């Protein structure tokens, strides 16, 4: 198969949702259809000992939430599928946002009883900003939920995207009978031995069923007043195809997967800082690091840089340019994933995600190129932390483990590190509280370094240039610190303190982000 044909087979997407909408369960079912797992390990039993394949970190297994984005790959129906499972928890927006830079489409999982929730809305806005297609799976039809028409209306009003139902539920909860499949023009049956039936048989199958009569009325209404189906509008991110189903009972999921792969796009090009778009079908390899993860295998204390291949082909042992440093690197120890399990890979193509073993060479956002190509891809989004804690080792004899742990976890971008200019104390900054809990848990579990963490509350962060820096600017209302790149930064106790500083030093430029 030619390189172009291989690239065109790739489908790389992320799954986004609010916590508990069923995202991990649907991921499991997709892996099941891809032949990667023998049974979908129902995530329901948080005490059952059957853990989701994609939730590999200890704290995720204990709490039943995804806190890092994992990558999984399988072959299905002539396509190579790359799934990026994103954290559903709101505190992990930074990792999630970066992950969404590495995909060509998104699947949005919505709980039929709850509709569009806060985290879904946040993540959707990022996806919308990138103009990538969004496919909606309205989940938990095996339970009582809201009316389908009401859910479609909410999609359009809250998210501002047109919708087109690919199927329609016949009843829900205990009265759930199946799906009226508008796209494939058939009925998908929830009960009994037969999985499908023709629409012509519907009246006979559901004689005297008020839900079926309601479905026919709804469909007539949608055909008259609903949006037109348009493949181009889907690819442009202007229309979301909507599927109903139940991930827990694995109903409607395979039909969803088949239809998703029919319409999901091939790998996209990516913009460089100069505004050029790198064509995925170009023969020269290029890619960018969108995530770094330490200790995916605690036995080996390893670090892996996740790279989205943007163009060309990766071959084991190839040399690449690291644009940020201007130095070369060799990609010899490279892996592909199934959550915590992995295998060495000898080649991969545009659209694929590879993991490069990293001894500290790479940073999130790095661009890799070959030959004379020295461009950089557009920077990934960064977030200014809002809450802070002082951190120190509980046991001074464990200083070495403490420093190693902090260095690795900060390089992942999971948490941000600052050092007090005057006292040398370490301070951690995060977008949400859960990040601190995960940090503490991982320091103790992975680095055997117990830590003492003291809350500092919310702070307003502003960077200043070295040239403007004068230590006398530090006062009781701010803390002067350095970030991990040794850039000076002020942590103001509130917006009033920030305004007071700006009035006192009008010539000093304060930057919101590095």
From Swiss-Prot:
Pfam family, one: EF-G_D2
Its biological purpose: Increases the formation of ribosomal termination complexes and stimulates activities of RF-1 and RF-2. It binds guanine nucleotides and has strong preference for UGA stop codons. It may interact directly with the ribosome. The stimulation of RF-1 and RF-2 is significantly reduced by GTP and GDP, but not by GMP.
Entry's Gene Ontology molecular function annotations: GTP binding; GTPase activity; translation release factor activity, codon nonspecific; translation release factor activity, codon specific
Any GO CC annotation of this UniProt entry: cytosol
Residue positions binding GTP: 17-24, 85-89, 139-142
Species of origin: Streptococcus pyogenes serotype M2 (strain MGAS10270)
HAMAP family documented for this protein: Rel_fac_3
Main subcellular location: cytoplasm
InterPro entries named in the record: EF-G-like_DII, EFG_III/V, G_TR_CS, P-loop_NTPase, PrfC, RF3_C, RF3_dom_3_sf, RF3_GTP-bd
Primary gene name: prfC
The family this protein is said to belong to: Belongs to the TRAFAC class translation factor GTPase superfamily. Classic translation factor GTPase family. PrfC subfamily.
Alphabetical GO biological process terms: regulation of translational termination
NCBIfam families tied to this protein: prfC, PRK00741.1, small_GTP
Keywords tagged on the record: Cytoplasm, GTP-binding, Nucleotide-binding, Protein biosynthesis
Protein name: Peptide chain release factor 3
Subcellular localization: Cytoplasm
SUPFAM superfamilies in the record: EF-G C-terminal domain-like (SSF54980), P-loop containing nucleoside triphosphate hydrolases (SSF52540), Translation proteins (SSF50447)
Start and end residues of each tr-type G domain: 8-268
